[in-house]
Amino acid sequence: SDTPEAYVNADVTQDDPALQSALEACNNYTKASITYTFGSQTTTLNGDTIKDWLQFDEKGQLIWDDNSFQQHVADYVAQLAATYDTVGTEREFQTTSGRTVYVSSSVYGWKIDQAAEAAQLSQEIQSDSQTANSYGVNDLGDTYIEVDLSEQHMYYYQNGSDIFESDFVSGNMSYADRQTHAGIFTLYYKKSPDVLRGTMKADGTYEYESEVQYWMPFDGGIGFHDASWRDEFGGDIYLTDGSHGCINLPPDNAAVLYDIIQYGVPIVCFY
């Protein structure tokens, strides 16, 4: 019987060495499996996606186009960053008083170094590695300091438990340049004792100089500290008789906070 010519002259058969080497080359790249963990979320890049980044000629041979491949890698990392970067994003926050507020953060959180990540990812795919890249918890979790500037009251939650509370006096609302900023911050360092100074004036003296026993800065020159010169804290004091921006605490409470505050703890300030 007449066998259709197409079957007789199949250009490439399954055991064709060229096809085998193309498959092998393709498999080398698509064997990679890279899992990223962002806080409680994970995402995996594997052969299902990588196979679409490869190019083949009309005979099914893998053509290595480095520019095209690196572009795919860069695009993938950019997409990860858009999805998971938290620095500079606004978060919804549930306050202890029962409100929902939106707080943005220019410092707290994390941000992918896209160039470095793309270079590493490209390397991992080409060496068909099975890796897990973990990034720190990107949400606030259940350990944080809540600074409610409208209530003039703060809370320190550790693993969901309220371990510290205090009234305070924040930046004076009568002066635009003294108002405490809303945002998400984190402790820079702590020092005991310290002298806090305002802006230096033309005659070489400072706008103010205050000696404090407990200094915990978290936003430029703004931080938590004891204010032994105040008799009262909380309420409406901050509206007209507030600080230069700092969170003034009763001395005993400042001592307790100084003792328990951890580096890296998110400090959520809002009105």
Regions found by a protein language model. Name each.
Residues 1-210, 214, 261-263, 269-271:
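Surface-exposed, secretory/extracytoplasmic low-complexity segments enriched in Ser/Thr/Asn/Gly/Pro
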Residues 214-260, 265-269:
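Active-site scaffold segments
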